């Protein structure tokens, strides 16, 4: 399977026009014979990419005082907890914020407030803040998230996830794609037998089909 994925990535690179920005690499998987109406069968995984994501991951944190200082030092954008209620009343602004960042963190004391006012915005996007205990440096969590991608099907048979960027080499991209493939198939009753199709592509390039071996 690794060779098939590598061949598809190579073809995607060859067929993708040059852009003035760094494109991401994406994988699209379509399932078959899986009852996604049952939440137990849905894919919801955080995959640590062995070669990283190839581009900076945007992280924000609801934090105040000392924890906010630590977060800023780690390159995390800090959101003042006092603005949570206002964001909850401005759904458009909250959605904009949810799109702006890849991951959210929050000091434990603020988790309840976030859940009360913002739950309906980040949760459907799989971006509910991760609680940070007062004794933990947020930099430790942020470092791990820099190489993490979310694989999430919800109730859809087709789902997409990023696994790298055009700036990465073939071996790095292949290793990342294989990490996702291995995790997804391990969660399916029949493994690759539950996958109808798999495609890889750059952000703006054509989708290249990966030959699936059951």
Residue ranges of predicted features:
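OB-fold/S1-family RNA-binding modules
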Residues: 1
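Interdomain regulatory linker/hinge segments that flank or connect interaction modules
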Residues: 7-15
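Translation machinery proteins
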Residues: 15-69, 86-94
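Flexible, glycine/charged-enriched surface loops at secondary-structure junctions
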Residues: 20-24, 187-199
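Solvent-exposed alpha-helices and their adjacent loops that cap or buttress functional pockets
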Residues: 50-54, 95-99, 151-154, 190-193, ...
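Flexible glycine-/small-residue-rich
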Residues: 63, 162-165, 202-204, 212-214
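Residue-level signature of catalytic and energy-coupling elements of molecular machines
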Residues: 71, 200
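Long, charge-patterned amphipathic alpha-helical coiled-coil/hairpin "stalk" segments used as oligomerization
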Residues: 82-187
């Amino acid at each position: 399977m690794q060779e098939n994925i590598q061949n598809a990535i190579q073809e995607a690179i060859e067929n993708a026009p040059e852009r003035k920005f760094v494109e991401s690499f994406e994988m699209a998987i379509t399932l078959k014979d899986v009852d996604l109406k049952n939440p137990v069968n849905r894919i919801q995984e955080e995959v640590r990419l062995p070669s990283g994501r190839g581009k900076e991951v945007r992280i924000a944190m609801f934090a105040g005082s000392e924890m906010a200082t630590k977060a800023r030092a780690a390159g995390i954008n800090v959101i003042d907890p006092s603005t949570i209620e206002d964001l909850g009343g401005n759904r458009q602004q909250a959605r904009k914020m949810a799109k702006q960042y890849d991951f959210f963190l929050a000091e434990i004391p603020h988790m309840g407030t976030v859940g009360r006012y913002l739950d309906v915005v980040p949760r459907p996007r799989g971006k509910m803040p991760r609680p940070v205990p007062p004794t933990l440096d947020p930099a430790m969590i942020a470092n791990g998230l820099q190489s993490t991608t979310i694989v999430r099907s919800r109730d859809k048979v087709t789902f997409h996830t990023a696994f790298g960027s055009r700036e990465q080499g073939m071996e790095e991209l292949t290793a990342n794609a294989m990490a996702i493939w291995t995790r997804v198939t391990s969660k399916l009753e029949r493994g690759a037998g539950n996958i109808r199709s798999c495609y890889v592509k750059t952000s703006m390039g054509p989708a290249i089909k990966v030959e699936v071996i059951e």
